[in-house]
UniProtKB/Swiss-Prot annotation:
Gene: atpB1
Family statement: Belongs to the ATPase A chain family.
Molecular functions (GO terms): proton-transporting ATP synthase activity, rotational mechanism
Protein name in the entry: ATP synthase subunit a 1
Main location: membrane
Membrane-protein topology: Multi-pass membrane protein
Residues passing through the membrane, by range: 23-43, 82-102, 120-140, 186-206, 207-227
Listed GO CC annotations: plasma membrane-derived thylakoid membrane; proton-transporting ATP synthase complex
Main function: Key component of the proton channel; it plays a direct role in the translocation of protons across the membrane.
Length: 240
């Protein structure tokens, strides 16, 4: 296959009601969700007091996510947010690794080609918007209308900056994840075409590492934003 045959932005469109959606993103997202559900069911089907095998792995993953959430949100209020942070981390982690390990491009489609769900900007923007909604909800649930005082404290002059900050958070989350995963898959694809045997292997291993790091960064920032929403700048300063 010639290098010129590499394409970016080709999509399989599905018409659902009045909406036009990217079909290949839904397919790969369902596959990732299916993998997570199947592994979870198998790991918890026969729970033992002394875990082993898949149960041991899942308990380690749960402990990792719980510690991550606790470190970002704090001992007192982290528990309700473990499911959300854990879902984000596991979905992004498996999605990223699927792009590096699964031969999506061997599956032919009428248009476009399959790739990791996080290789599509729509997926990363959706994850970032969910995170934004959750940290707004967290602050509003705890403080009520008083949550919005942060926009005018310590002075109303900072209102535009505070609003701009709320817009830049989901933008940075979505474009960081999308850009890293897309760049990694493109680099591997180009190297496979040019030198198909040995050279791409180190890059693929590096891609697996960076894919895991991107999932960790996204989940860590989501936890940090929720903590900021729960505590607020003023309360954090008083605590110190």
């Amino acid at each position: 296959m010639p290098l010129a045959s590499l394409e970016v932005g080709q999509h399989l469109y599905w018409q659902i009601g009045g909406l036009k959606v990217h079909g290949q993103v839904l397919i790969t997202s369902w596959i990732v969700i299916g993998i997570l559900v199947i592994v979870s069911v198998l790991a918890t089907r026969k729970v033992e007091r002394i875990p082993s095998g898949l149960q041991n792995f899942m308990e380690y993953a749960l402990e990792f996510v719980r510690d991550l959430t606790k470190n970002q949100i704090g001992e007192k209020e982290y528990r309700p947010w473990v499911p959300f942070i854990g879902t984000l981390f596991l979905f992004i982690f498996v999605s990223n690794w699927s792009g590096a390990l699964f031969p999506w491009k061997l599956i032919s489609l009428p248009e476009g080609e399959l790739a990791a769900p996080t290789n599509d900007i729509n997926t990363t923007v959706a994850l970032a918007l969910c995170t934004s909604f959750v940290y707004f909800y967290a602050g509003f649930r705890k403080k009520g209308l008083g949550y919005f005082r942060k926009y005018i404290e310590p002075t109303p002059v900072l209102l535009p900056i505070a609003i701009l900050e709320d817009f830049t958070k989901p933008l940075s989350l979505s474009f960081r994840l999308f850009g890293n995963i897309l760049a990694d898959e493109l680099v591997v694809a180009v190297l496979v075409l040019l030198v198909p045997l040995i050279v791409p292997l180190p890059v693929m291993l590096l891609g697996l590492f960076t894919s895991g790091i991107q999932a960790l960064v996204f989940a860590t920032l989501a936890g940090a934003y929720i903590h900021e929403s729960l505590e607020g700048h003023g309360e954090e300063e008083e605590a110190h």
